[in-house]
Amino acid sequence: MIQVFELFPGVTLRFFADSRFKQGCLSFQLVRPMAAEEAAMNALLPAVLLRGTQAYPDLRAITLHLDDLYGASVSALVRRVGDYQTTGLYCSFMEDRYAMDGDEILAPMVDFLRQLLLEPVMEDGGFSADFVESEKKNLISTIESELNDKRVYAGAQLLKIMCPEDAFGIPRLGDRASVEKIDAKALYRHYQRILRESRVEMFYVGSASPERIIPLLKNMLAGIERCYVNLPEQTAFHDAGGQHTRETMDITQSKLCMGFVTPITNRTENFAAMQLLNTIFGAGMTSKLFMNVREKMSLCYSIGSGYYGTKGIITVSAGIDAHQEETVRSEIVRQLQLCQNGQITEEELTAAREAVLSGLRTVHDSPGSIEGYHATASLSGLRLDLEEYRQAVISVQIADVVAAAKTLKLHSSFFLQGVGE
């Protein structure tokens, strides 16, 4: 069970007591409305903060300090959750009860997080220019590596054309041009502003009591002058009109991406039915798209669907030969129409239900998966706790899935055609 504590206005701790693990975790996230003008800066910030503090001014010093904390680790945390982008740090550390000779780990870990957040290496009124330039190169490399994965690239292009006036079309890490414009002083000014204004979400998993950790976290944040600006609520997909676009590229396998929209989100009652519909339609090896379009008809090399529950968007991605484009388009639509017409078997529903339930069962397998699921779910606006979600999935019937399918409409598509095909 998750306990929720408001430490200060706009500062929330979500507390998950669990003594099963030797490791605990603590995440710190600044939650921002997703915006093109700051996405790249938010993506860059955690990496710069991790480069050094006033007491531990370089990576070697940080590594030695974490080794002293029984091999603790701190990593960058950048997420996109619907209309939000989060930027922050994730800490993993041994529980105090496993330390030798009564050593403490939790309190020094929280203090080190404080130093990373509030005592960075400074230079001429900004972050270290060397640190910023180095991490800009790393971020650009990450952005380009995603672009070099043509499946990921095509999916991102689809979301851009579907969401020209919706924050969901903004890349999670920003773009190369935005990264290149960032300088150390501007990044520090931005950081100071979002520390003051942003909603702060912290998530703890471990065996410490709330009475133990809350004073540590309050003390960590006491030095921040806050002027919290309320965060807008998540919104469903903003439809600015559909598009069907194409692009050519020197690749051997073409990529077809199709986007469908629905009013069903994770904030509506029939969310579980839409999750099962997505699984039956295209998510997994028992889905209609995989079993029919790929296996029986051999029309594609790969195919699958994904449901963005915060926005009410389902996307289908397929790796195909260019000459099969129209055939594959038509067959994807036909497989959805089969669902809409009620041609779903009990076997398909059972397989889909078990796939979703299996995923839910793994949520509590590790501190990291607990934090990842629940921290994201709370930001996304999901109205069901884990057990309510599980029961909702169990109770879904074929008629519910068919009703969910009937709400889906094709909105946009993007075709990335190989020039050599």
Question: Model-predicted segments: where are they?
Answer:
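Glycine-rich, mobile lid/loop segments that gate access to catalytic sites or pores
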Residues: L139, I143-L147, L158, M162
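Short, polar/flexible loop-turn hinges at active-site or ligand-entry regions and domain interfaces
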Residues: G52-A55, R97-M100, E119-S128
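Short, flexible, solvent-exposed loop/turn segments with mixed acidic/basic and small polar residues
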Residues: R79-R80, Y188-L195, G304-Y308, V402-K406
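His/Glu-rich zincin catalytic helix
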Residues: M1-L69, D101, D175-S178, Y188-N292, ...
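Short amphipathic beta-strand starts and helix->beta connectors
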Residues: Y70-S75, V179-H190, G242, K296-I303, ...
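Short, low-order "capping/linker" segments at domain edges
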Residues: S141-S145, G242-K255, L357-G368
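M16 family metallopeptidases and their MPP-like homologs
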Residues: R14-F16, K22-N42, L59-Q115, R151-G174, ...
